A protein has these predicted regions:
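C-terminal lobe/hinge of AMP-binding adenylation domains
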Residues: 78-79
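Nudix hydrolase/Nudix homology domain
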Residues: 3, 9, 14, 19-21, ...
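Compact nucleic-acid interaction/catalytic patches
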Residues: 85
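Acidic, metal-coordinating catalytic segment for phosphate/diphosphate chemistry
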Residues: 23-63
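Unchanged
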Residues: 88-164
């Protein structure tokens, strides 16, 4: 992501093997507001965000793009896929605190510092027969942590790694 000043948007492109983070411009996102691509053709799915959200249970979560001194990115391996550390916000918890707590719990790192607020992403899924819309707040973080990374196995995380 070096050399992309002003780029504050991250696109998550998922394949069956891993999630890849790619920087894209804010103008690209704004031109696609409330659009979904179906068979490579844009289709507007909603014109009123509140009306759209009314069909779902809303959940807030937070996570981080965490870099160490070597400019390596912290990744977790959960459910057979590489992903970024993130998790659900507890009641009355500040979103920044949630992001740091989740990274600490899922990876065993400490000394996290939030350096930048990134974008929010949305994920739709079904849980126990109910439709859920999860909003995840993303933060760029740094750490000087040099200890052993510890995956949170009770959350299904089997590996934690720094990647270039």
């Amino acid at each position: 992501m070096k050399g992309l000043s002003g780029c504050k948007i991250i696109a998550f492109i998922c394949s069956k093997d891993l999630a890849t983070c790619l920087p894209i411009s804010i103008s690209e996102i704004m031109t696609q507001k409330y659009k979904v691509f179906i068979n490579n053709k844009p289709k507007i799915i909603v014109t009123d965000w509140k009306k759209f959200c009314a069909h779902y249970i809303l959940i807030e979560a937070a996570g981080g793009l965490v870099y160490n001194r070597e400019d390596e990115l912290l990744m977790i391996f959960r459910n057979g896929k590489w992903d970024l550390p993130k998790g659900k916000k507890e009641e009355a918890e500040e979103i920044e605190s949630c992001a740091k707590r989740e990274v600490e719990e899922e990876c065993g790192v400490s000394g996290l510092e939030i350096t930048e607020k990134l974008i929010d992403t949305y994920h739709i899924y079904t849980h126990k027969g109910k439709k859920v819309l999860k909003r995840t707040y993303w933060f760029k973080m740094t750490t000087n942590f040099e200890g052993v990374l510890i995956p949170q196995t009770k959350e299904g995380i089997t590996k934690v790694a720094w990647v270039k």
